[in-house]
Amino acid sequence: MAEMTPMMRQYMEIKEQNKDSILFFRLGDFYEMFGDDARKASRELDLTLTTRDKDKNKSFEEKIPMCGIPYHASDAYIARLIAKGYKVAICEQTEDPAAAKGLVERDIVRIVTPGTVIDSACLEEGRSNFCAGIYLDGDYAGFSVCDISTGQTHVTAFSGPDREAHLQNELGRFAPAEAVLNPGAAEDTALRALLEDKLRCHVERLPAGRFQLPAAEKRIRQQFGDDAAQRLPRDNPAAMLALGALLDYLHDTQKTDLNHVDRLDYYRQGQFMELDLTARRNLELTETLRGKEKKGSLLWVLDKTKTAMGARLLRSWLERPLLSVSAIARRNDAVAELVKHTVQREELILALTGIGDMERLMGRIVYGSAGGRDMVSLKNAMDHLPAICQQLAAFEGGHLRELVARLDPLEDLAEVIGRTLQDDPPFSVREGEFIRDGFDPEVDRLRGILHGGKGIIASMEAAEKEKTGIRTLKIGYNKVFGYYIEVSNSFKELVPETYIRKQTLVNGERYITQELKDLEHDILSASDRDAALEYELFTRLRQTLCDAVTRVQGAAAVVAELDCLCSLAAVAVKNNYCCPVVDESGVIEIHDGRHPVVECMRPDAMFVPNDTYMGEKENRAAIITGPNMAGKSTYMRQVALMVLMAQIGSFVPAKAARIGIVDRIFTRIGASDDLSAGQSTFMVEMTEVSDILRCATSRSLLILDEIGRGTSTFDGMSIARAVLEYCADPKKLGAKTLFATHYHELTAMEGTLPGVKNYNIAVKTRGEDIIFLRKIIPGGADRSYGIEVARLAGLPSTVVNRAKKILRQLEEEAGRPAPAVQAQEDQVSLTALSEGEVIDQLRRAQVDTLSPLEALNLLYELKKKLN
């Protein structure tokens, strides 16, 4: 340690306090990294790692590895490190190096973590970036999230035996990028697995001392006010503990007042439809199962928003379907009004187009990280608001009129920004030249000196050329030497004695004169004074905007909601949706319903619509049979998606629909081995079914696909029947259930259990070919057509025919009729060729090489086989 320079000791002291972060240490115009941080940054960012030589006579700092990045390009590098799961501590020079006596003071100004990102380079425009606070202890669970880029904050709490299930559902809903946990939550292996493995969430464990009720309440009151703190439940302190610890963590890492974090949404269980992670995944609400892409999801269909705020809000609506009939009706009525008035809707959409991200722009302004360009972007967004107010005033609908009453046009703020800043200000606010001409007399005066000084420099250059005869003479400037006279080597003999040499170049020399230095002082002092004054004016403007943060956020919220409503209306018109009736009836009645995503993914194909009727008593459970690939899963998913769409206030893809409020949607679809946890497909299936039976209510909608597969036939059939009986029986669960199965024996339940109804997917056979009609019809299927589907999938004909023989034998042993199949042990008889095999033979025929006679003989042969 004795060998360290003062600067290196300063670095080590700061690094000691931030061991879990990569330290960006400001040195002039660069952020430097040393030691292990340098090795990590070099590897992750593809930076050149420089290592001082190993000479024992060299000081400590000369021996350690180092690398660096330009400070003005740091956002992109930070984004890459955050994406790889690192934390980055930003250490700045906290005093002017020119005024420093000795070592420049430095300190951590901010710690960037996955959940505390504000820079646009690190953020997805249409998605919130949440940091979560989680408290789990005994019977209580508390959950809170905050997106510091927008100020959006939510908090809730749970208690009782299902508290962890509810907590996991909320984690799936908000998908935080980072979570701070109390010891009880950190030691919960299932919770950690969900966070780290499934959600890819960065986890920070905080000590129990950070979760103290008095301190939490004080922090919440300071941040949101007394009224907000008073709304939090007193009988379950977990909400307050989770939120208080989260706010503490945000203040600790951000080193600033989060004044824009002033909107607290406390919500209770029962305000929104619950969807567990499995249901969200299977229904592909925001991303596809396989590619994890937006295209192919329900969000892809519905999202025609024009603003980043609207895109984030629409995603939130999909994640949080409503349970209040009146709240749904307000959205529904607004969408209906927009659908009805085409011209006004299109004008509104045009006014929304081009509005910048007011929420995140305001967040950066309050944060102190915004530049002049951010403020001009905010002003440009505000310029759209008066036109939106005017367009909204033309509507008669109640909710749209409420929105216009809430929309502050912010004309005064837009005028202040426009009067203060140039239309296209430079990137930096520290070097001047961004305040509008005429705004401040002193700025104008200093600029006159600056611009006049540049003219004087040009005149001096011309005079020196003429006086010395040096044609290549030029006067330049850099931050090291200031102004200088540069002369090429070919004219060195003409340099006057009054020139003082300062630097030798490859092709020439640089000089100064006393006259040039005197002029430099006058110009640079004016430049420094102008830059300082312009920055002072900028900070005043920033404070004006900070004082209006609530107004700006309120306007942004209205714009976002209006954008969502316009998006839903545009989609409804384009895709021919209907306005559903949403009530408390407990009935799901759909006429000619369609799958919203499938019909958009295949616009050239004709989608076959289907009816649905499910009541509280009759048709409570539908057993759906039919072959694979016929459309059972598509049908069940489309019912679930239409229910969800109706409960976010959207129109639905049908001719008519009536949707009784559904409190939860559960799905058990497809196979998903959890090999990392040592669980087989069947174990995962049974675990999911167990969760459904434990958490579902009579108001839930269950989508169950092929329960019981993965074990022996009789085991699977027994489990499937027992599950269906439990779901359909009103004395046990009585939930609305769509139950797809290949166990045709279960169709006998229609006559034995009230509320159970059989349906099947219609198919048409032609010989041994099968045509899927995609139509749901009453009654059970007589067979599964598995072998026909296998043939369509391309299995060799010998395998297909062997399967037919085995099926016939099995059905004979079971006492069931089987179609006649002629087969040999090793060779298939020619007379047993099906229509499909004739087609296969035609496909294999090399038509171009056949003579006319050979072709005719082949045709006779094939016709003979068919007969």
What is the predicted function of each stretch?
Residues 171, 176-184, 190-193, 205, ...:
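Conserved catalytic alpha/beta cores of large enzymes that bind or transform nucleotide phosphates
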Residues 1-337, 346, 353, 357-366, ...:
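Charged catalytic and DNA/RNA-contacting regions of genome-maintenance
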Residues 35-38, 236, 240, 306-307, ...:
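ATPase nucleotide-binding head domains, primarily ABC-like/P-loop NTPase cores
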Residues 208-221, 273-277, 285, 289, ...:
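Amphipathic heptad-repeat alpha-helical coiled-coil/stalk segments that mediate oligomerization
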Residues 441-451, 455-459, 828-861:
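C-terminal accessory/binding modules appended to enzymatic or scaffolding proteins
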Residues 328-331, 351, 355, 453, ...:
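Intracellular alpha-helical coupling/juxtamembrane segments of multi-pass membrane proteins
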